[in-house]
């Protein structure tokens, strides 16, 4: 299980409660932990570009339909809840989620929102 991998997760809480694809967010350096931090996908087409990142299906990522990564729903689940390997995010999508997580957590300024002086 590596950062950027797309896997299935089922049996988590709230938004990861039903089986759905997730991307592994946690750095590979922390693979000895019993849990893993993930970001779930949804097929809901809500347009919220700062925290719902559109990802189109392709051969590398293994997604079957257009999805959105729910950056506002990052969660940590037990590794025992992580299922099948689906694919892997493209490098460009990994960079997009990196930036989106930083902005959502307030660790970086959004390129789309003007900061007040």
Where is each model-derived feature located?
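Conserved functional hotspots at enzyme active or ligand-binding sites that engage polyanionic ligands
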Residues: 1-117
């Amino acid at each position: 299980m590596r950062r950027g991998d797309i896997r299935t997760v089922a049996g988590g809480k709230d938004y990861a409660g039903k089986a759905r694809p997730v991307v592994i967010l946690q750095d590979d350096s922390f693979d000895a932990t019993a849990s893993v931090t993930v970001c779930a996908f949804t097929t809901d087409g809500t347009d919220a570009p700062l925290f719902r990142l559109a990802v189109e299906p392709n051969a590398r990522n293994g997604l079957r339909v257009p999805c959105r990564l729910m950056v506002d729903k990052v969660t940590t689940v037990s590794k025992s809840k992580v299922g099948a390997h689906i694919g892997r995010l493209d490098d460009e999508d990994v960079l997009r989620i990196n930036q989106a997580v930083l902005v959502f957590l307030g660790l970086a300024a959004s390129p789309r929102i003007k900061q007040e002086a």
